Amino acid sequence: MGRDKFFELLRKNKLLVRKQKRNVYTTMSKHHFRRYPNLVKDFTPLKAHELWVADITYIPTIQRHAYLFLITDAYSRKIVGFHLSDDMKVSSGIMALKKALAQKPADAIVVHHSDRGIQYCSTAYTNLLQQHNCMISMTENGDPYENAIAERVNGILKTELISNQYRDADTASKHIARCITIYNYKRRHSSLNWQIPASVHEQKGPQIKQWKNYYYKREKATKNVVES
């Protein structure tokens, strides 16, 4: 009996072992640190370094999960800071933030938007933002629409560029760095009129379909339903 027939027999007799889905959580929102309000519900950036969106996504490796900290410019979709770590400590988030801050013009006032995870609410992280003239914005609940651009960038990286599983974090780190370079300098976006992030990053003014304010539209639609 071949493999396919064998598995078909197991399936018919309900003897296949159901694959267990392992959920990996990257947001630790139960903490005592201050939670900041959402400042970007109806905000549309018109140039780079006006709004950054931050998020964490897990990267599977054979040894253990690694965690990719990302900071993306919402105007250009360019990833301006990233760090791959084998933990979700505040210090790992700060590594990504420092890379982004190194690119920020000294006189720019940036809104840094994230979820309410401990990595972003911690005193060390928020102090660093305030020291560099950054305003702090956070999601108000678990709705992914409140950080839609960050979620979209995660999806692009993981479905188009990043491997399904790496041998270890070191291998992952080297490959992901190359993937982000490809994303920034070669990957075209329909939301940027098919331009690349690196090119848009040097522009100013509205972009064609450049940033849909998903949360604002969703909130407005919900309000209309309630009032009708």
Task: Spell out what each predicted region is.
Residues 1-48, 198-205:
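Basic, flexible linker segments flanking DNA-binding modules
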Residues 6, 10, 40, 55, ...:
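Mobile genetic element proteins and their domesticated derivatives, centered on retroelements
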Residues 26-29, 114-116, 122-123, 136-158, ...:
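RNase H-like two-metal-ion nuclease catalytic core shared by retroviral integrases
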Residues 31, 83, 112-113, 189:
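Histidine-centered active-site/metal-ligand motif
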Residues 45-80, 86-88:
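An active-site-proximal beta-strand-loop segment
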Residues 64, 82-106, 121:
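Active-site beta-loop-alpha junctions of metal-dependent nucleic acid enzymes
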Residues 78-82, 136-139, 163-164:
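Short small-residue beta-strand/loop micro-motif enriched in glycine and branched aliphatics
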Residues 130-134, 156-228:
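C-terminal domain-tail junction helix/linker
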